[in-house]
Amino acid sequence: ASIMSGFTYATLTTAIQDYTEVDSNVLTSTITNQFIENAELRILRDAPIDAYKKQKIGNFVTGQDTINVPAKTLFVKGVQVYDSTSASTGNNRWLEKKDESYLQEYVPSTETAARGQPKYYAMFGGATGVSDTDSGRLFVAPAPDTTYTFKIHYETIPDGLSSSNTTTYISQYFGN
């Protein structure tokens, strides 16, 4: 059995033009780049690759029920919260993912009496994946009553195939 050698940016754009039987005057690089980006994101979503699994450790701010997800996050796989405020070892719990409306109904306030160790999380805020301030946010409930250590397990968005990044893991191993 032979292994496909994969694509470079140049060979893939040529293959797209050959398949559609049009040249670069009709099928511009802007259009083919969007095809490529959409395909890469679909592959990453449907066939998670171990090399792109990451973890981020941090601490909650007492009374603050939202945190930024890490830069270039494609999706969050899970969130652990530790009993400790200084270590990501020992007793911990996995937060249960819920809809934002569930969390708002579960604990409608961040007042001191409503705080505790978070049990639930929800995603919100839309995401472009470029930086930690625009990669979406996590909403937790209840709001933390101390600076618990957390660990976010997530799938990252690798640099995509482009004229300046001519090969990627996906272009080499997901050729057809």
What are the language-model segments listed below?
Residues 4-176:
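Glycine-enriched, solvent-exposed interface loops adjoining structured elements
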